[in-house]
Amino acid sequence: MEEKIGVFICTGYGIGEALDVDALCEVATGEFKVPFCKTVKSCEGAALSAMNADIKAEGLTKVVIAGISPRRYSSTAFPPEVMVEMVGLREQVVWCLPPNDEDTQMAAADNLRMYITKIQQRKPLVPFQPEDEVSKDLLVVGGGVAGLTAALEAAKTGYGVKLVEKSDHLGGWLAKQHKSIPTKPPFRDLEDTGIQELVAEVEANPNIRIFTSAFTAETDGAPGLFDVTIASSGNGKPEGEVIEKIRVGAIIQATGWRPADPRPDLPYGDLEDVILNVDLEAMMKADGRITRPSDGKEAKKVAFIQCGGCSGKEKHSYCSSICCMTSLKQALYVREGRDDAKAYIFFEFMRTPGQYEDFYRRAQEDDGVFLTRGLVADVAKNEDGGLTITATDTMLGSEIQVKVDLVVIAAGMIPNAADGEAIRALEDAKVNVLDGDSEAKRVAAAETLEKLGHHDGTQILNLNYRQGPDLPALEYGFPDSHFICFPYESRRTGIYPTGAARQPTDGMGSREDATGAALKAIQCVEMTSRGEAVHPRAGDTSYPDFMMSRCTKCKRCTE
């Protein structure tokens, strides 16, 4: 289409009273030979529709609007094929300088000249389109509540979803729970988890294809062009056997969590009747009874030790946000239908945010639930075959001892996520130990191996990226973006962590989080298909020119 420039000059908002608008029109049509220039009384609302009609009628390809701030317009105010520049005469000239003054008129004319020159030099952006067809299918890694929710929400909007789960069944940790903490008013009574209904809905959706007993063996490519190799995780097939190679547009990592290791001062593993909160949940899920593992007898007195998976600043010093509510829930398990049963909860901090405060009150109102703000100093076997807990009541400053049948440690959440940068450093160190240029380099590599050795074999996504096979991780192993303003974004565009893999959360929080991640993944594939940037310059269609003479082939620009 032949280039044609038009100028609209607004006389409203006090602009016409402060400036000689006809002189500005002369600048456009005289100095710049602009073929179309028109004054308008307003540049919003109905006047905006009239301007768009003029743009279409005159066949304008480039437009300068001299009026109010460009912030007053949305990105869809003008046809996408028309290039538009906006001169803020009101904010930049009229409000800043005296009206009907020579300098004011000169400032307005100079502003108009700058923007006409700018629009003359602008060239239409040609969005980048890859040679291969962009895929709009999504890959969800993880079949827990977050993964199932993300898959279902995306599938409901019409997108194809591939769901990969390493175990032989869907549901994750929520499928192993007896009951769920309340998720709706009045936030007092325990609820069914609802996970089986969610699994059934996912399995029945024709847009979702499920791979169980599988993992992502290799991930190549970029947004819209991720090539993923799905392999068997065992469970009837040879481990590592390739099941299928697929192409997807975006990836949602919903790999969940695992229990934290208990504090070393607690005798977990040494005393049979000291268990984790996940063990008690499995016990209730199996037959609805709470028994002592040591002899199978019914446990009528159960103690809960909060923050049992914390090791101060050395290991797990963050709050997992769900442990307190879980212990309150399990205390109600103990009391359910048993008037003579007692539950003791030892805590330093009781955290029940938001409406969960009502659930806390529900537990407080139960005569058989004893809440003690205290630090547990010792758990030992007693002469009755049970356990004796010695604790310091931090409210009263006194030492107390309680005899119980069973001790439950509230272990926190550790994300099921790999640190891609740490794994890459580990792989590089393995090479340097053998082939280092100097002894000092080999010694440094050996130290890195010792420091990062626990990352070996933790890969999840297996990205073929120079910067590492998984997402970069934050301080405590959660993959995130570091950007408060960009939730769900990771530092690998097109890959979105969600649920407990992204931050400690409960089932209801995981559902909400997964819905957001699904929306971001959909946004990614749609914007990629149009050749637009996804993050952080959302909607930008510009594409870089590479100076190949200075390229070192580090591959960072492509990863």
Per-region residue spans from a language model:
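Residues forming the flavin
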Residues: 1-559
